[in-house]
């Protein structure tokens, strides 16, 4: 899971595009249809996740704020799901494309290491 939108409800108040973005995709206002926002939010279904999960997120991601990842991470950890969260300080939503070279390498190596661990 990387730079993910996991909760439409909290995205509204925390994302740099949060005010109009959800309405554009969900075609309804949160005040009119909160149930729709919850139904379309992956975090609503997080209790069904049992698969080991790697979460990668940048601390200065203002598009999909880090709190989105923290919600999933805390849910999985509380329930004992094998979960790792890697946070990149001073990186934005663009980490994989234009982040600092050492962070892009670290990100890539973390993904490879995670898969090696899970496949052995």
Locations of regions flagged by a protein language model:
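Active-site-proximal cap/loop segments of hydrolase catalytic domains
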Residues: 1-120
């Amino acid at each position: 899971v990387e730079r993910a939108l996991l909760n439409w409800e909290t995205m509204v108040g925390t994302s740099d595009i949060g005010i109009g973005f959800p309405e554009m995709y969900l075609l309804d206002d949160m005040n009119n249809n909160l149930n729709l926002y919850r139904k379309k939010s992956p975090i609503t279904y997080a209790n069904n996740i049992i698969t080991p999960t790697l979460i990668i997120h940048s601390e200065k991601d203002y598009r999909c704020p880090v709190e989105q990842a923290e919600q999933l991470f805390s849910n999985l950890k509380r329930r004992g799901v094998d979960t790792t969260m890697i946070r990149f300080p001073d990186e934005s939503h663009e980490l994989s494309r234009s982040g600092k070279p050492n962070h892009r390498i670290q990100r890539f190596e973390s993904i490879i290491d995670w898969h090696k661990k899970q496949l052995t």
